């Protein structure tokens, strides 16, 4: 019997079933990020300023990545737009010749190779949809395999999305097509709807966002299939066959989003169906190239003060290269690193533009000055100073602030020079055999972050190979180095650019005598007529001695000077960041924290959550061993660890009820406890079901009322 406001609603005699709308459920409340910075545990007087600095810096980095992705996809999208605008020319001309009719049976199809980074496909296809709507046609539809198990659902989803793209969404006339959504999903009715809409569009309304496609009498319909590999073969075959029969009245263009290889088209479609497609291949930028560009714009630049240590960068790149190839995940990893840096490092308030950082140093409090003195890099710096200066740095706040401003400026100049020399060195080493210092600049960057690169065997090997470069190769590399140095707006390397230009001039001025000398020294001595072993060995020894004692040519001397110059640049400017005072202000080095958040082991995470819920819930009552107030699944998990291979459900339920009732201090004889026992039983069933879902137990027929305890490999 219902009570309260619903009593009158259930008083009917003839009705036996009553339907009620569910009560409004509050949405899950998400804690804003700034609340974490205002937490009492974060004992810092500038926590609000740190959060504001984080927000501004991330917005700058985010806008840079968005602009970068637009530039990377611009060429691909332009080619796709050209392809789509050239499709269905006979349809636009209303040509009725035999050749046109034959072509009407071929559906223009763009095979878009996006790569295996499936998580990035949505972003790319979303941008592509917007581009096509702005430049080609307003009728752009995207479908996923999970929404299209058969042709009926395929047409239903296709039709509903297509009608949402109709000419004027605010026009009442267009709503006449909505009846089609609920009644009929066939290609004939869709063609009729398209014909009616385009005729109305020609006379009454203008197509939304119809800019570059104004010459189209009837805009084409573009269908994008996300992850073509996920679609069933029969659905694709049926839809393509049906659509090809209606191309003369429904100008369809297909775009296949392919993650693997174009071969998938022939695997899913037989020749009789694939022959109905006019396929053109489009290749997006590879994942590794995309990663290199993102690193180049976000980290290998003095434009943004935030930097990653070697281990933190390796965590992000390893997740990218060995897990998902996702640029979006990599960018989220950088965002998480930035957030962790500003949250955990009190002096991250100085991780901003140099001018702003100097202003903030001037208003530092005594406690903030003490934070500077506690930095390990600053301690090492103080230890290397004269005694009088040490005392001033440790006792005089004014002198400390002035020196901090100077060190921050030195750190800024260090990064400018560092990245210029790094790019120059990469130009020299990226084309060497076997790539001793890596083929990608990120590999060279990680090596330079870790240690003094000139002490490594790889660097010495690379230098030996560079000393054997030909003149043309060396001149080409030096020209690229000049382009790198000229591209920098801040000239900090002194006369380095001029010296490289002087080297180029000297190479160009090598006269013919040096070439003849080089040829003469490289040619073998003449007159070796005897071929016996004794004379051959004697000749080889003479040639070796001649090579050892010969005077180097002008080219060899000049090449040696260039290599020595580059070696000195590396030793002067590619010092590891740990050698710089105050590097902790801008470098995030908590690689373990990053790994726990981004690359957690599922088994360890599950066991930790169930065995020690305090680790995640941060509830003081749950600290230590699992108390009675822990979540039900934690109690059930702890009890199941005490059982053998087969678990008696009755004993398990009684033990669970004993633990829970002890926590709630209920009287077993009371009426309330009898009602609660049913609730406890339901809670136990839910906990057992959750453990089964996680793979800890499974049903068994060996014994009645028993379940089998599982391990990760089996029973």
Curated annotation (Swiss-Prot):
Entry comment on modification after translation: Multi-mono-ubiquitinated by OBI1; ubiquitination is important for efficient DNA replication origin site activation. Ubiquitination levels are low in mitotic and early G1-phAse cells and are induced in late G1-/early S-phase, peaking in S-phase and decrease toward the end of the cell cycle.
Presence of the UniProt keyword DNA-binding in the record: yes
Phosphoprotein keyword on record: yes
Record GO terms (molecular function): DNA binding
Major subcellular location class: nucleus
Highest taxon listed in the record's lineage: Eukaryota
GO cellular component, one term: chromatin
InterPro entries named in the record: ARM-type_fold, ORC3, ORC3_ins, ORC3_N, ORC_WH_C
Subcellular location field: Nucleus; Chromosome
One Pfam family from the record: ORC_WH_C
Cystines in this chain: none
Any Gene Ontology biological process: regulation of DNA replication
Function description: Component of the origin recognition complex (ORC) that binds origins of replication. DNA-binding is ATP-dependent. The specific DNA sequences that define origins of replication have not been identified yet. ORC is required to assemble the pre-replication complex necessary to initiate DNA replication. Binds histone H3 and H4 trimethylation marks H3K9me3, H3K27me3 and H4K20me3.
Family per record: Belongs to the ORC3 family.
Subunit composition and interactions: Component of ORC, a complex composed of at least 6 subunits: ORC1, ORC2, ORC3, ORC4, ORC5 and ORC6. ORC is regulated in a cell-cycle dependent manner. It is sequentially assembled at the exit from anaphase of mitosis and disassembled as cells enter S phase.
Name of protein: Origin recognition complex subunit 3
Species whose genome carries this gene: Mus musculus
């Amino acid at each position: 019997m219902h009570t309260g406001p619903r009593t009158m609603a259930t008083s009917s005699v003839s009705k036996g079933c009553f339907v009620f709308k569910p009560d409004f459920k509050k949405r899950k409340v998400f804690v804003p990020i700034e609340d974490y910075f205002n937490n009492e545990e974060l004992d810092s007087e500038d926590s609000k300023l740190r959060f504001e600095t984080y927000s501004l810096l991330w917005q700058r980095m985010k806008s840079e990545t968005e602009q970068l992705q637009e530039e990377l996809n611009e060429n691909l999208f332009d080619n796709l737009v050209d392809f789509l605008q050239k499709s269905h020319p006979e349809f636009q001309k209303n040509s009725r010749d035999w050749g046109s009719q034959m072509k009407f049976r071929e559906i223009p199809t763009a095979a878009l190779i996006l790569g295996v980074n499936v998580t990035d496909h949505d972003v790319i296809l979303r941008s592509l949809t917007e581009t096509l709507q702005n430049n080609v046609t307003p009728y752009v539809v995207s479908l996923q395999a999970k929404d299209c198990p058969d042709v009926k659902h395929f047409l239903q989803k296709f039709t509903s999305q297509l009608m949402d793209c109709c000419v004027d969404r605010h026009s009442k006339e267009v709503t006449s097509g909505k009846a089609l959504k609920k009644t009929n999903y066939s290609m004939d009715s869709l063609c009729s709807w398209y014909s009616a809409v385009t005729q109305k569009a020609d006379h009454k309304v203008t197509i939304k966002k119809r800019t570059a496609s104004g010459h189209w009498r009837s805009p084409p319909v573009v269908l994008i299939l996300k992850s073509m590999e996920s679609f069933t073969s029969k659905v694709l075959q049926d839809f393509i066959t049906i659509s090809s029969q209606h191309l003369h009245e429904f100008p369809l263009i297909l775009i296949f989003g392919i993650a693997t290889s174009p071969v998938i088209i022939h695997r899913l479609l037989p020749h009789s169906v694939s022959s109905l497609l006019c396929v053109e291949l489009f290749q997006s930028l590879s994942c590794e190239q995309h990663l290199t560009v993102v690193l180049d714009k976000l980290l290998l630049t003095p434009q943004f003060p935030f930097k990653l240590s070697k281990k933190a960068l390796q965590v992000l790149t390893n997740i990218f290269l060995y897990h998902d190839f996702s640029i979006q995940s990599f960018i989220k990893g950088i965002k998480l690193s930035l957030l962790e840096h500003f949250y955990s490092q009190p002096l991250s308030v100085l991780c901003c533009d140099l001018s702003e950082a100097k202003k903030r140093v001037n208003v530092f409090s005594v406690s903030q000055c003490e934070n500077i003195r506690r930095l390990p890099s600053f301690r090492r710096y103080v230890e290397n100073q004269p005694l009088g200066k040490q005392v001033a740095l440790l006792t005089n706040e004014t002198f400390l602030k002035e020196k901090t401003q100077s060190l921050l400026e030195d750190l800024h100049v260090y990064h400018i020079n560092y990245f210029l020399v790094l790019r120059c060195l990469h130009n020299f080493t990226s084309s060497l055999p076997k790539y001793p210092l890596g083929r990608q600049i990120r590999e060279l960057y990680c090596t330079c972050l870790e240690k003094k690169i000139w002490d490594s065997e790889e660097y010495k090997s690379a230098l030996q190979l560079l000393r054997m470069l030909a003149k043309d190769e060396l001149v080409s590399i030096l020209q690229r180095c000049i382009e790198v140095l000229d591209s920098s707006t801040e000239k900090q390397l002194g006369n380095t650019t001029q010296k490289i230009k002087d080297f180029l001039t000297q190479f160009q001025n090598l006269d013919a005598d040096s070439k003849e000398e080089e040829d003469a020294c490289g040619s073998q001595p003449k007159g070796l007529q005897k071929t016996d072993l004794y004379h051959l060995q004697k000749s080889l020894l003479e040639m070796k001695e001649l090579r050892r004692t010969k005077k180097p040519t002008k080219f060899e001397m000049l090449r040696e000077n260039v290599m020595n110059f580059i070696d000195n640049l590396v030793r002067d400017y590619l010092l590891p960041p740990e050698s710089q005072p105050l590097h902790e202000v801008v470098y995030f080095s908590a690689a373990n924290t990053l790994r726990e958040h981004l690359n957690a082991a599922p088994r360890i995470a599950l066991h930790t959550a169930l065995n020690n819920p305090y680790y995640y819930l941060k509830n003081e009552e749950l600290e230590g061993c699992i108390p009675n107030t822990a979540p039900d699944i934690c109690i059930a998990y702890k009890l199941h660890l005490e059982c053998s291979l087969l678990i008696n459900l009755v004993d398990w339920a009684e033990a669970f009820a004993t633990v829970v009732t002890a926590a709630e201090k209920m009287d077993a004889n009371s009426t309330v406890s009898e009602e609660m026992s049913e609730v406890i039983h339901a809670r136990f069933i839910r906990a057992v079901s959750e453990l089964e879902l996680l793979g800890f137990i499974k049903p068994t027929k060996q014994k009645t009322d028993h379940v089998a305890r599982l391990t990760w490999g089996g029973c």
